[in-house]
Amino acid sequence: MESKLSLLLSLLCFITCFHTSFSASGETNPFKSVPDLEKSMYKDIEGFPCVRLLNLTGEIGCSNPGREKVVAPIVRFKSSKELTESAAILVSVDEFESVLSRVSKDSDFASKVAGIFVESRSQVQNGLDGFSPDVKFPQAEFAPYTSNNFQWNPAQGSGIMWKAYNFPVFLLSETSTSIVQQAARASENSKMSYTKVVSEFDLVMQTTKSGTHDSDSCLKEGTCLPLGGYSVWSALPPISLSSSPKPKPIVLAITSMDSASFFRDKSLGAESPISGLIAMLAVVDALSNVDGLTELNKQLVFLVLTGEAWGYLGSRRFFEEFDQQSDAIKGLNLTAIEMVMEIGSVGMSFSQGTKTFFAHTAGDTTSVNETLSALYSAQDSMSENVMVRKASTSNPGVPPSSLMTFLTKKPEISGVVLEDFDSTFSNKFYHSHLDGLSNINSSSIVAAASLVARTLYIQAGGSDPLALNSININASLVEELLGCLLDCEPGLSCELVQRYISPSTTCPNHYVGVILGEPSTARYPIYAGDISRFVWNFLADKTALPSTNASSSCPKHCNGDNELCIRQEAVEKGVCVISSTR
């Protein structure tokens, strides 16, 4: 299912590599060719760019001031308090926000900033109180309540990712940080000489033609592309598409798979939201092993959304699919959705030895109380120290979440968002490049997944205590997913991902992509990103029933109702299964 809305748009025309030029200083070197000379003068530096985005009201992010490349000497921030000439400033992460704050307030200083390099170093999170470039109430304009001055992200939310900067900004890799630090020192030491070490931003990071400053105009002119991607839903057990009795009420479990960051290619989002995604995949895996799900009086449906970090694109598109009666939601009945349970940030739940989660609720009191009762029953059935608490009544409503879209589009719906925080984010690095693997704990995710899996079973009508107690989360699967989705080693080259798809890259990144062309009606999202294709295959596999065409050529002879071809990228021929996965 494709998320395509014209809320926030971007032409990702940027470069992730730039040159640092070193002038000769009296040394004579024999050069046999022009490439030899160039190699002695330039060092290629790896960086992760801040890119330009446009919305209906204007521009945010970074771009060059014009269409010429930028060349400027490199200086450290501490020595650049009063810039006498245009310079590229090298800053540490803890200095970064103050530099951008000065740029916003001091026009003379801003006019001399040619670019900014941000250092990387290992374990930098340990020395920071926090770093979040998002605002104090992320996406407040989509809240279904009026208290949008509430601060869910109070201490760290600087809002710098929502401003426009007319100079390039790059996050350096750790290796490149050392090189640029040396260059900055060389610039300092050469103040009295004619030699300079300069940075050269080798390509113009310009997103739109002159005069195009919002998403509406650039879309009409074809000079930008809409943000978006493929969301995935699946039902357990599969929903029959043939004539059948009245459809069962639906218990809908949702989570999201995309994050955001100041730097596009450094958006892991480990705590927010990938901990929830991993918990969801583990939940589906656990419930797929439970017998008797077809006899339950409610239908379990799982929805993994993309584009949620940018205006809830995925969940808004989900409702648009219903308005259009699209094939993407064939088998689903919007009016049948009785309860929504969202898995939010669940990777940091430890409190005095107990894993504590908070249930943020909205909607009909009776339905909410039934869900809370199911959560408490699930909690009591677990042997480990896990606690569920109802979120504070002083909160204005649910925290930033996909449930906000559901409450706006279908106000009568009831829902619960499970989080590891009550009134303020636990995540000090929300929507930051620092929200990585070290920011979360696998046992917290396992506990959340156990809680949700058992709660969903109870909500769907399961009452067998033996079946309930048999629902256990595969902790090894959670660990494997952490390595696959939040690290470069093994990253997407891990055995689990390779079992389903042939990824285009090894290092995962969860920043939403762009949409090329019209949404596809194909059953398999072949042009979707690596994460969406993996999630689609995983859910289709775990929720599947065997097909009578299992031994047939796939996908050629896999075209019956609810028949899907999974693993077609990973093996010579895929496997045909019956699954309600789109």
Where are the regions a protein language model picked out?
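Secretory-pathway/membrane protein signature
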Residues: 1-582
